[in-house]
C-alpha cells in the first residue's frame, strides 16, 4: 500500500461515515408538522401530576441584562421568550438570536412553579397563579451587577407565594427562588417543578436545513443524574410516548440544539422526579418535580432552582451544575474533541484569532503524530522494495493462491515488514479529523468567528470556495510527489480524480475544517520530503521511482 492508495482508503472511510450519519439522521420519520397552541399542556401518563395547566391570559413583562432579553408571563411566571443580544441571529445581522419563542408557528418555553397538594400550579387548585409585579420592565442598570424580579401571589386562604428571578451581569444562569408563607392553620405540602417544552417540528423560519455532506448536531432533550452523567432523549421517543420517569438526587434536565441550550437544575436535598411527556399538538416536554416539603403554619419555606438559557459555554455551564458542560454536542468522538477544544481555547487566549489558533493546533497535532507518519512512509517504502520479489513469486506460483499467501507472509516476516503498517497511522488520523469537525460544528465560540480576508465565519462554508480549491491543489501536489505501485487502470483513474472528489466534498464544509486540512496537507508535503531524504540514505527510496 502506498500514499495514493491511502487517499482512496480515506475517501471510502469518509463516504461511508457520511452515509451512516445521514442514515442516523433520517431513519426515524419526523412527526408531521402541526399547528401549535397554548391550551394543551398537561403531561400524560406517569407524569400527569407534573403537567402545567393552561397559562391563560397574563401580563408580559420585560427583563433585560447585558446578555439576556427575557419576556415573562405573569400568569404562572413562565419565560416565554429569550433573546441573546451578544449573539446575532445571522452574520452581520442586528437582530439577536432568539432561543425561546411563543408564537402560533413555534413554542419553546421555560416553565416553572409550585405544585404538589397545596401548590398554586397544581391543576386541581384551579388556574395557574396570576402574579403581581411592581413594574412592566426590569433593566440591569449601568454599574449594577444583579437584577431581581420579584413576583407575588396570594391564594384564597391568605398564603403568599413569592417567585423571584435573579439575574447577574454577563451570566446566562437565572436563579429562580421561591418563598412560601403559610398563613393558615394546616401544613402546606409543596413541590417545585421546572419544565421545558418545545414544538417537535421546526417551522420554516427556524429550519435552515443543511447540505447533504454536513454532520447534524443533536436537537432534543437530555438529562443528568449522579448515575448517568449525560443521556440524550430524542424528540421522536417522546412523540412515541416512550417517556422518561426516574428519581434522582441532584442532576438536571435540558433541551439542546446546535450551539445553544436551556436547562433546569433543581437545588434541594431531596429526591427529584425527572420526566418527559408528549403534551399533544406536536409539543414535547422534559422536566423535574421535587420531593414535597411541608411548610408549617406561621412558617416560611424556601425552594430554589437555576435556569440556564443561552449559549453552550462549557466552563460557565460546568459551574452551574455538574456535567452540564457535556451538553456541547461533540458526538461519539467527544473524548477527542473535548481535549482538542481545550487546547484550541488555550492557544486562542494568546493569539486572539480562532483561525490562527486552528493553524497552530494543526502543527501541534501533526507534530505529535510525526512518528506515526514516519512509520507509515517507512512501511510503504519497504513494501515497494518487495514488489519485484512479490511479482516474481506470483509468476512462479501461478494460480496457487494458498502458497502465494503463505510465502508472502514468510517474506514479510523475514524482511520485518508489516503489510498493515501503512494503514494504522491512517486509522489514527481519521478520528482526529472527524473530532475536529464535531468540535467546529458544536463549539459556540467558533460560531461567526472571523479569520482573515474573506473568511468571516469559520463555522460556515467558504462563500467563494477558495479554501476547498486550495485544499484540492495541495492534495494534487501530495499525489504527484508520492511514489506509486498502482498498475490497475481503474485504480489509476480513481487516484487521478481524488483531489477533485475531495474538493467537491469540502465545498460545503466549515471553513475552519478546510483550513485545518490545507495546513495539514502543507505539513504533509514538508514531512514527506524530510522522510524521503532519510529513506534515500537507507536505500529505501529513489526519486527516480516517483511518478511525475
From Swiss-Prot:
Reported function: Required for the insertion and/or proper folding and/or complex formation of integral membrane proteins into the membrane. Involved in integration of membrane proteins that insert both dependently and independently of the Sec translocase complex, as well as at least some lipoproteins. Aids folding of multispanning membrane proteins.
Ranges that cross the membrane: 6-26, 350-370, 420-440, 458-478, 499-519
Protein name in UniProt: Membrane protein insertase YidC
Tree of life domain: Bacteria
Bilayer topology annotation: Multi-pass membrane protein
GO CC term, one of those recorded: plasma membrane
Main location group: membrane
Single GO biological process annotation from the record: protein transport
Oligomer and partners: Interacts with the Sec translocase complex via SecD. Specifically interacts with transmembrane segments of nascent integral membrane proteins during membrane integration.
Location of this chain's protein in the cell: Cell inner membrane
Record GO terms (molecular function): membrane insertase activity
Amino acid at each position: 500500500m502506498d500514499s495514493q492508495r491511502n487517499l482512496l482508503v480515506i475517501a471510502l472511510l469518509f463516504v461511508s461515515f457520511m452515509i451512516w450519519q445521514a442514515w442516523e439522521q433520517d431513519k426515524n420519520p419526523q412527526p408531521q408538522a402541526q399547528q401549535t397552541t397554548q391550551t394543551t399542556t398537561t403531561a400524560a401518563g406517569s407524569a400527569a401530576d407534573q403537567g402545567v395547566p393552561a397559562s391563560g391570559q397574563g401580563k408580559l413583562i420585560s427583563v433585560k441584562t447585558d446578555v439576556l432579553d427575557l419576556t415573562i408571563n405573569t400568569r404562572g411566571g413562565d419565560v416565554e421568550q429569550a433573546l441573546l443580544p451578544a449573539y446575532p441571529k445571522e452574520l452581520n445581522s442586528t437582530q439577536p438570536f432568539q432561543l425561546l419563542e411563543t408564537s402560533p408557528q413555534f413554542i419553546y418555553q421555560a416553565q416553572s412553579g409550585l405544585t404538589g397538594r397545596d401548590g398554586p400550579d397544581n391543576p386541581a387548585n384551579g388556574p395557574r397563579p396570576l402574579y403581581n409585579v411592581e413594574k412592566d420592565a426590569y433593566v440591569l442598570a449601568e454599574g449594577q451587577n444583579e437584577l431581581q424580579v420579584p413576583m407575588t401571589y396570594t391564594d384564597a386562604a391568605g398564603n403568599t407565594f413569592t417567585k423571584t428571578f435573579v439575574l447577574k451581569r454577563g451570566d446566562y444562569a437565572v436563579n429562580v427562588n421561591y418563598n412560601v408563607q403559610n398563613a393558615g392553620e394546616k401544613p402546606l405540602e409543596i413541590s417545585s417543578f421546572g419544565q421545558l417544552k418545545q414544538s417537535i417540528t421546526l417551522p420554516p423560519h427556524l429550519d435552515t436545513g443543511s447540505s447533504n455532506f454536513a454532520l447534524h448536531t443533536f436537537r432534543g432533550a437530555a438529562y443528568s443524574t449522579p448515575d448517568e452523567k449525560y443521556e440524550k432523549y430524542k424528540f421522536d421517543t417522546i412523540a412515541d410516548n416512550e417517556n422518561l420517569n426516574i428519581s434522582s438526587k441532584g442532576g438536571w434536565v435540558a433541551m439542546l440544539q446546535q450551539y445553544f441550550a436551556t436547562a433546569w437544575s433543581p437545588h434541594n436535598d431531596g429526591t427529584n422526579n425527572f420526566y418527559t411527556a408528549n403534551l399533544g399538538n406536536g409539543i414535547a416536554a422534559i422536566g423535574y418535580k421535587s420531593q414535597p416539603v411541608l411548610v408549617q403554619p406561621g412558617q416560611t419555606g424556601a425552594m430554589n432552582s437555576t435556569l440556564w438559557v443561552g449559549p453552550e459555554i462549557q466552563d460557565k455551564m460546568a459551574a452551574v451544575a455538574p456535567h452540564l458542560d457535556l451538553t456541547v454536542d461533540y458526538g461519539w468522538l467527544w473524548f477527542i474533541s473535548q481535549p482538542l477544544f481545550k487546547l484550541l481555547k488555550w492557544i486562542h487566549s494568546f493569539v486572539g484569532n480562532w483561525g490562527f489558533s486552528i493553524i497552530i493546533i494543526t502543527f501541534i497535532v501533526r507534530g505529535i503524530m510525526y512518528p506515526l507518519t514516519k512509520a507509515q512512509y517507512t512501511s510503504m517504502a519497504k513494501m515497494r522494495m518487495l514488489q519485484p520479489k512479490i511479482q516474481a513469486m506470483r509468476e512462479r506460483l501461478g494460480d496457487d493462491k494458498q502458497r502465494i499467501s503463505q510465502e508472502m507472509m514468510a517474506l514479510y516476516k523475514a524482511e520485518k515488514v508489516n503489510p498493515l503498517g501503512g494503514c494504522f497511522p491512517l486509522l489514527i488520523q481519521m478520528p482526529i479529523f472527524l473530532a475536529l469537525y464535531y468540535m467546529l460544528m458544536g463549539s459556540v465560540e467558533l460560531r461567526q468567528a472571523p479569520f482573515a480576508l474573506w473568511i468571516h465565519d469559520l463555522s460556515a462554508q467558504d462563500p467563494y470556495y477558495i479554501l476547498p480549491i486550495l485544499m484540492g491543489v495541495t492534495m494534487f501536489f501530495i499525489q504527484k510527489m508520492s511514489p506509486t505501485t498502482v498498475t490497475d487502470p481503474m485504480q489509476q483513474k480513481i487516484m487521478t480524480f481524488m483531489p477533485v472528489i475531495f474538493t467537491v466534498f469540502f465545498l460545503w464544509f466549515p471553513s475552519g475544517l478546510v483550513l485545518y486540512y490545507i495546513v495539514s496537507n502543507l505539513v504533509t508535503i514538508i514531512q514527506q520530503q524530510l522522510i524521503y531524504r532519510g529513506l534515500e540514505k537507507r536505500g529505501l527510496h529513489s526519486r527516480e521511482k516517483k511518478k511525475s
